[in-house]
């Protein structure tokens, strides 16, 4: 029994782990949770935290892996960058421009990096988020329409850049 528990515990680390990518001169991190029993390319859900949140917090609060993995969907939880007021956020322009990072470019590069390391169905890439992460899902749907298949937002509405 101990051996089985050890094997199952070890397998979860193979399919779920933190990654870093250097984008815009800074190190950016994201957590990928890939379905452990996938035999064909998986879809990808980008699940973004709200203002002041963290990728780790988004994992814990949403528990999206439990729902995504049985549907052959991987989930990535990117970490927003530090804002000018010392808390993490997504730069979507408008009144949410608390940081000067190119978050759309970061997410695009992250998608490319994940697709090069995992079997991802590039026709099934979805964006979702809470609050500031929800605003970011709208931004990605507009700015990365060549990559994002569909999106959803919780407590974040569409803002027009002026």
Predicted stretch roles:
Residues 3, 19, 55, 93-94:
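A general structural-boundary detector
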Residues 3-16:
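Sec-dependent N-terminal signal peptides
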Residues 14-44, 56-62, 66, 70, ...:
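A domain-start/cap signature at the N-terminus of enzymes
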Residues 47, 77:
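Generic enzyme active-site microenvironment
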Residues 49-54:
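Active-site glycine-rich loops that stabilize anionic/oxyanionic intermediates
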Residues 79-102:
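Cap/lid segment of the alpha/beta-hydrolase catalytic domain
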Residues 96-119, 139:
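Alpha/beta-hydrolase active-site loop
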């Amino acid at each position: 029994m101990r051996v089985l528990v050890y094997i199952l515990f070890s397998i979860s680390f193979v399919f779920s782990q933190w990654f870093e990518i250097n984008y815009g001169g800074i190190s950016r991190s994201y957590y990928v949770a890939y379905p452990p029993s996938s035999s064909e390319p998986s879809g990808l859900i980008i699940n973004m935290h709200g203002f002041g949140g963290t990728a780790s917090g988004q994992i814990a609060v949403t528990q999206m892996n439990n729902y995504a993995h049985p549907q052959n969907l991987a989930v990535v939880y990117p970490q927003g960058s530090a804002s000018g007021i010392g808390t993490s956020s997504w730069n979507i322009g408008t009144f949410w421009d608390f940081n000067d990072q190119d978050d759309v470019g970061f997410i695009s590069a992250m998608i490319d990096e994940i697709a090069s390391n995992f079997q991802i169905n590039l026709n099934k890439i979805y964006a979702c988020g809470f609050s500031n992460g929800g605003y970011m899902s709208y931004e990605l749907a507009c700015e990365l329409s060549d990559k994002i298949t569909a999106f959803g937002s919780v407590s974040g509405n569409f803002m027009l850049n002026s």
